[in-house]
């Protein structure tokens, strides 16, 4: 065969055309491509998809030549297709200038990534996998121009080819304006033929790029029906011809060439890198969900990141994030997101980054980045200038590339405020809107955000409120569904457990690891075909539900706890995400009632502060977490137990105790040191159980009426419960012993009722003490003394119901 530069001779070209025509005309055989051509005609298409494996079986020599000498062979193949279409439907063949061939199947050594695409593949058919990072605008390119000369009444036709077409030699780019006799020509635009033309850039997959090296990219030329098939962020396989373009500078061709890929077929890879599972796997998943229906959520949460000790609530939240809620697009076009965003804030060395790394390895699609290494446009999208044409083009950022996945941002507090503001729209609306340099575009970025940050002071200061420690604006915090504060606490028993756990991790060794060999980070097996040939074999492999117990890996004390294997976890999450649970009326009423309780200031104690503001987004958070919990149970409805589990997570994440600084005293009781130790242990326990019992008791006592700012009876009922669950510091208990004489409960209730009438009758927020004394003692058979009134006012001031200043009573 002649070299590619010389091209095929006419005889060889005709022979190749005959071979391809015989391959297509298989009506006497199985009739596969005869039927495909008829389907192409009925669908009004002009590109036929051919499996290279079929051609290899019928004519191996021709298949090898097609892969190694693509330009001439593809021209012969397309001519054969046009002849075959003309024999089937002559009228349809005249409608289109050309018919095109698309290839799929197994390409073997020619199945490459942008990094392994080298000069040896020039003029060959290759299959390249990558992720789309840039897309140019669609431009019309002239294929044939028709010109009319009014003087001679003649018509001139000219065809144009360049290096992006299959022809060996490009035609002249001069557009005719005069004929040979210098008569002016008029262009007949209606008779001229144009084709669509677009350039995209694909980059190698982030998970397949070698660590520490920049990802490589390659430009792809799309023509005709292939344009606008992909957008930034899509993962695709491109089959096409690899070609080099000479670079001209000042009329001279330089020695370096620019390489491009001329596409003939594009296949969208699955948006969710879905695991392969068989009917047997689905049966195991259903059996597992039914057998462990009571504690299946806790079982899965314990199996998340088993190498990390503790953090039970955070693991439950991460499981909810991986499962996700249900996204809703309303009729008016507005979208209610189903993605769950989580922020981890805490001291150094509490496994924040390790949890992020685990999610990166578990989620089907995850992109990891850091605060210092990310800019606002790098996370969302950027408008860049094409060096070749000078036109503007859109470049996708990390959040667009992670559409339908998870974005893990470490060192979130190190980002600048301007860059953090750029992700506001992404976190709530799930899209990126760009309006720059004449480009107005909207890209999907429906992803969950998992961020880890350190407090403002490096370590968490428990004597300051959470808001002072976090140092992020409320507009950003309200977009996070859950905010967890992770503390490095001084507890000898817990430290002993952690040290034992970490030492066991260092002593553990994978049984498959050989001496002196490091295990690979990713899978060493790559599929060198557009379709997975080993799909059936992988289906037959037995799916292990539980990991085999190992004393070093799981600990000798956890023999009874079964850990779900990573592969089963991936498949279970993928199946559970497909379920769309519906809220029941009971759970909806419960969520609405608990949301109003969270908003109420009466739930706040003096030493408890909120980690993030409770807004209307908190209501959506409760719904999303309830839905995720229902998905874990494989339930089609969101029941009351799901709503209660979601509320438990929210209570743990939203409330944080603030310590009071101790004042030095000259005399200290011996028991003080013991009580302080007990209080420090109590501070480590979350306050959720106390609040949950208080709300349940309050609901049974009939606190569902509308809120009255002048009514003090509710607070009085709650006060003994609040005191029962609020540990007091030694100073507060000591000062409490030296208080003024107590007022009897009936007298205190009578005073509150009288004061209520005074405020209602005066229609004011503040009343003088003198006026109060006159009003409450008027027509009162048992008048209040001034000392008794002051004791009652002190009680109410302690309950944050009023404030007394300069004998003026202010209503709070």
From Swiss-Prot:
Name the InterPro entries on file: AAA+_ATPase (IPR003593), MCM (IPR031327), Mcm3 (IPR008046), MCM_CS (IPR018525), MCM_dom (IPR001208), MCM_lid (IPR041562), MCM_N (IPR027925), MCM_OB (IPR033762)
The family database entries (Pfam families) matched by this protein are listed as: MCM (PF00493), MCM_lid (PF17855), MCM_N (PF14551), MCM_OB (PF17207), WH_MCM3_C (PF23191)
Q: Which residues bind ADP?
A: 354, 394-396, 398
Q: Give, as one word, the top-level EC class.
A: hydrolase
Task: Name the reaction it catalyses.
Answer: ATP + H2O = ADP + phosphate + H(+)
Location relative to the cell? Nucleus; Chromosome
Extract one GO cellular component term from the record: MCM complex
Name the UniProt key words of this record, in alphabetical order. Answer: ATP-binding, Cell cycle, Chromosome, DNA replication, DNA-binding, Helicase, Hydrolase, Nucleotide-binding, Nucleus
Enzyme Commission number(s) from the entry: 3.6.4.12
**Gene Ontology annotations of biological process type:** DNA strand elongation involved in DNA replication; double-strand break repair via break-induced replication; mitotic DNA replication initiation
PROSITE patterns (UniProt xref): MCM_1 (PS00847), MCM_2 (PS50051)
Q: Detail which positions bind ATP.
A: 524, 665
- Composition bias, Acidic residues: 671-684, 702-719
Segments carrying motif Arginine finger:
478-481
Residue ranges of the MCM domain? 296-503
Q: Which GO terms describe its molecular function?
A: ATP binding; ATP hydrolysis activity; chromatin binding; helicase activity; single-stranded DNA binding
Which PANTHER family would you find in this protein's record?
DNA REPLICATION LICENSING FACTOR MCM FAMILY MEMBER, DNA REPLICATION LICENSING FACTOR MCM3
Q: How does it assemble?
A: Component of the MCM2-7 complex. The complex forms a toroidal hexameric ring with the proposed subunit order MCM2-MCM6-MCM4-MCM7-MCM3-MCM5. Component of the CMG helicase complex, a hexameric ring of related MCM2-7 subunits stabilized by CDC45 and the tetrameric GINS complex.
Q: What is this protein called?
A: DNA replication licensing factor MCM3
Gene name on record? MCM3
């Amino acid at each position: 065969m002649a070299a590619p530069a010389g091209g095929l001779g006419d005889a060889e070209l005709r022979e190749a055309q005959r071979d391809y025509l015989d391959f297509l005309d298989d009506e006497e055989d199985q009739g596969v491509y005869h039927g495909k051509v008829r389907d192409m005609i009925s669908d009004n298409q002009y590109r036929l998809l051919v499996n290279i494996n079929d051609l290899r079986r019928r004519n191996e020599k021709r298949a090898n030549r097609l892969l190694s000498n693509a330009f001439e062979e593809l021209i012969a193949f397309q001519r054969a297709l046009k002849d075959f279409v003309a024999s089937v439907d002559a009228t349809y063949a005249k409608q289109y200038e050309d018919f095109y061939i698309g290839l799929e199947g197994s390409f073997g050594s020619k199945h490459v990534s942008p990094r392994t695409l080298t000069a040896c593949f020039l003029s060959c058919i290759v299959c390249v996998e990558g992720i789309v990072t840039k897309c140019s605008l669609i431009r019309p390119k002239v294929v044939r121009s028709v010109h009319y000369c009014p003087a001679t009444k003649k018509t001139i036709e000219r065809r144009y080819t360049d290096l992006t077409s299959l022809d060996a030699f490009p035609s002249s780019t001069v557009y005719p304006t005069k004929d040979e006799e210098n008569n002016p020509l008029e262009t007949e635009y209606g008779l001229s033929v144009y084709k669509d033309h677009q350039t995209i850039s694909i980059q190698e997959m982030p998970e397949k790029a070698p660590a520490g090296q920049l990802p490589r990219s390659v430009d792809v030329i799309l023509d005709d029906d292939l344009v606008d098939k992909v957008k930034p962020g899509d993962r695709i396989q491109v089959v096409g011809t690899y070609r080099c373009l000479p670079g001209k500078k000042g009329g001279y061709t330089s020695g370096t060439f620019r390489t491009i890929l001329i596409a003939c077929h594009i296949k969208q890879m699955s948006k969710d890198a879905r695991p392969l599972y068989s009917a047997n796997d689905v049966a195991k998943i259903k059996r597992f969900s039914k057998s462990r229906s009571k504690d299946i959520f806790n079982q899965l949460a314990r199996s998340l990141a088993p190498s990390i000790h503790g953090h039970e609530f955070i693991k439950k939240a991460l499981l909810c994030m991986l499962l996700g809620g249900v996204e809703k697009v309303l009729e008016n076009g507005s979208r209610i997101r189903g993605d769950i965003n989580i922020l981890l804030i805490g001291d150094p060395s509490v496994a924040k980054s390790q949890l992020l790394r685990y999610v990166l390895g578990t989620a089907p699609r995850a992109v990891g980045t850091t605060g210092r290494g990310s800019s606002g446009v790098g996370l969302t999208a950027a408008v860049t200038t094409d060096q070749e044409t000078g036109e503007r083009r859109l470049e996708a950022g990390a959040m667009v590339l992670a559409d339908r996945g998870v974005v893990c941002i470490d060192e979130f507090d190190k980002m600048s405020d301007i860059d953090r503001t750029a992700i506001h729209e992404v976190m709530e609306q799930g899209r990126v809107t760009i309006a720059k340099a004449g480009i107005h575009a909207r890209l999907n970025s429906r992803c969950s955000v998992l961020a880890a940050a350190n407090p403002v002071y490096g370590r968490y200061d428990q004597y300051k409120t959470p808001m002072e420690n976090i140092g992020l604006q409320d507009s950003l915090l309200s977009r996070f569904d859950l905010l967890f504060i992770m503390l490095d606490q001084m507890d000898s028993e817990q430290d002993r457990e952690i040290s034992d756990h970490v030492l066991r991790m260092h002593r553990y060794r994978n049984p498959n690891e050989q001496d002196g060999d490091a295990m690979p980070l990713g899978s060493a097996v790559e599929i060198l075909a557009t379709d997975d040939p080993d799909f059936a074999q992988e289906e037959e492999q037995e799916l292990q539900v539980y990991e085999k117990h190992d004393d070093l890996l799981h600990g000798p004390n956890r023999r009874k706890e079964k850990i779900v294997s990573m592969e089963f976890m991936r498949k279970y999450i993928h199946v559970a995400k497909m379920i769309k649970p519906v809220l029941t009326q009971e759970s909806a009423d419960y969520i609405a009632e608990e949301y109003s309780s969270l908003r109420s200031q009466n739930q706040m104690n003096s030493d408890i502060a909120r980690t993030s503001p409770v807004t209307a987004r908190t209501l959506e958070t409760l719904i999303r977490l309830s839905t995720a919990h229902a998905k874990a149970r494989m339930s089609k409805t969101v029941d009351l137990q799901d709503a209660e589990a979601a509320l438990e997570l929210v209570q743990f994440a939203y409330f944080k105790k603030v310590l009071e600084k101790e004042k030095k005293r000259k005399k200290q009781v011996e028991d003080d040191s013991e009580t302080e130790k007990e209080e420090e242990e109590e501070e480590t326990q979350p306050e959720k159980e106390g609040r949950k019992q208080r709300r349940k008791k309050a609901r049974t006592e009939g606190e569902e009426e509308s809120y009255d700012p002048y009514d003090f009876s509710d607070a009085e009922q709650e006060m003994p419960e609040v005191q029962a669950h609020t540990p007091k510091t030694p100073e507060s208990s000591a000062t409490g012993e030296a208080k003024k004489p107590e007022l009897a409960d009936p007298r205190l209730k009578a005073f509150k009722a009288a004061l209520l009438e005074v405020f209602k009758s005066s229609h004011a927020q503040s009343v003088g003490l003198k006026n109060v004394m006159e009003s409450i003692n008027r027509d009162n058979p048992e008048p209040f003394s001034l000392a008794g009134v002051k004791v009652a006012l002190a009680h109410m001031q302690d309950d944050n119901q009023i404030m007394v200043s300069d004998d003026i009573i202010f209503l709070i």
